[in-house]
C-alpha cells in the first residue's frame, strides 16, 4: 500500500530536493573541473623552481571537490529512486550516506577555514624565492622564467616590500611591458594579485558548500519523515 496524504506530499518533495541535490553535485563537479583546468592557476601551479615544484595544496582540495561532486550525484540518484519506490532500505541507505557526507563537509569546512590563507601564503613564498634568485643571480634562468610567468599571468611586477620592488624596477625585462613605470609597479603588486586569485575561488567554494549543507539538512529530515510514514502505512 502506498503512502497517502501529507506523507505523499513529502515523498514528492523529497524527490524534488534530491533532484536539486543531484544537480548541485553536477554543478560542483563542473566547477571543480573548471578550477582544475583554469589557465591562471594551472600555469602557476605547474611551475618548478629547480627541483622544487609549486605548492599543490590547492589541487588537493580540488580533487576532493571532484570526488564530492561525483558522490553527491550518486547519492541524489539513490534518494530519488528510494523516494519514488517508497523503499525503507534505500531511504535508510540514503540517510546514512547523507550523514557521512555532512560530517565530511563540516570537517572539510573547519579545515578550510583554519587554512584559508595557507594556499596563497605558500604560493607567495614560492614566488619570493624565485624573485630573489632571479635578482641575485644573473644566470638563474629557471628562476627568471618562473618570475616572468607569474608577472605575465597575473599582470603584476614585484612584491609589496620596498627591496624587491626596487630591484623589480631595475629588472624591467622580468616585468610586463605595461608595468615599466614606478607608479604602475606600485599598483601591480604580485602578492595582492595572488591573494585575489585564490581568495575569490575559495569564497566560491565556501558559498557552494553552505548551499549544499542546507539542502542536506532538509533532505535528512524529509527522508526520516518519509521512512516513518512508509513504515506506518505498511502497518495499516
Curated annotation (Swiss-Prot):
PROSITE patterns assigned to the protein according to its UniProt record, in alphabetical order: TM4_1
Post-translational modification: Not glycosylated.
Signal sequence interval, chain numbering: none
Residues given in the record as cholesterol binding sites: 219
Protein name: CD81 antigen
Its biological purpose: Structural component of specialized membrane microdomains known as tetraspanin-enriched microdomains (TERMs), which act as platforms for receptor clustering and signaling. Essential for trafficking and compartmentalization of CD19 receptor on the surface of activated B cells. Upon initial encounter with microbial pathogens, enables the assembly of CD19-CR2/CD21 and B cell receptor (BCR) complexes at signaling TERMs, lowering the threshold dose of antigen required to trigger B cell clonal expansion and antibody production.
InterPro entries: Tetraspanin/Peripherin (IPR018499), Tetraspanin_animals (IPR000301), Tetraspanin_CS (IPR018503), Tetraspanin_EC2_sf (IPR008952)
Positions in the Cytoplasmic compartment: 1-12, 85-89, 225-236
Alphabetical keyword list: Adaptive immunity, Cell membrane, Disulfide bond, Immunity, Lipid-binding, Membrane, Transmembrane, Transmembrane helix
Amino acid at each position: 500500500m502506498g503512502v497517502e496524504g501529507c506523507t505523499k506530499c513529502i515523498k514528492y518533495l523529497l524527490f524534488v530536493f534530491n533532484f536539486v541535490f543531484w544537480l548541485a553535485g553536477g554543478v560542483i563537479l563542473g566547477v571543480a573541473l573548471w578550477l582544475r583546468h583554469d589557465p591562471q592557476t594551472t600555469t602557476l601551479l605547474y611551475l618548478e623552481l629547480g627541483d622544487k615544484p609549486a605548492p599543490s595544496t590547492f589541487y588537493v582540495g580540488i580533487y576532493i571537490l571532484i570526488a564530492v561532486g561525483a558522490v553527491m550525484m550518486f547519492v541524489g540518484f539513490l534518494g530519488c529512486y528510494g523516494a519514488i519506490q517508497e523503499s525503507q532500505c534505500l531511504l535508510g541507505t540514503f540517510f546514512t550516506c547523507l550523514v557521512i557526507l555532512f560530517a565530511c563537509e563540516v570537517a572539510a569546512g573547519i579545515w578550510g577555514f583554519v587554512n584559508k590563507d595557507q594556499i596563497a601564503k605558500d604560493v607567495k613564498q614560492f614566488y619570493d624565492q624565485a624573485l630573489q634568485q632571479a635578482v641575485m643571480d644573473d644566470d638563474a634562468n629557471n628562476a627568471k622564467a618562473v618570475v616572468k610567468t607569474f608577472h605575465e599571468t597575473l599582470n603584476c611586477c614585484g612584491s609589496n616590500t620596498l627591496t624587491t620592488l626596487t630591484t623589480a624596477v631595475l629588472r624591467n625585462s622580468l616585468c610586463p611591458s605595461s608595468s615599466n613605470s614606478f607608479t604602475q609597479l606600485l599598483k601591480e603588486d604580485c602578492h595582492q594579485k595572488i591573494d585575489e586569485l585564490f581568495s575569490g575561488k575559495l569564497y566560491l567554494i565556501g558559498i557552494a558548500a553552505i548551499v549544499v549543507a542546507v539542502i542536506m539538512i532538509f533532505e535528512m529530515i524529509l527522508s526520516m519523515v518519509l521512512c516513518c510514514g512508509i513504515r506506518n502505512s505498511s502497518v495499516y
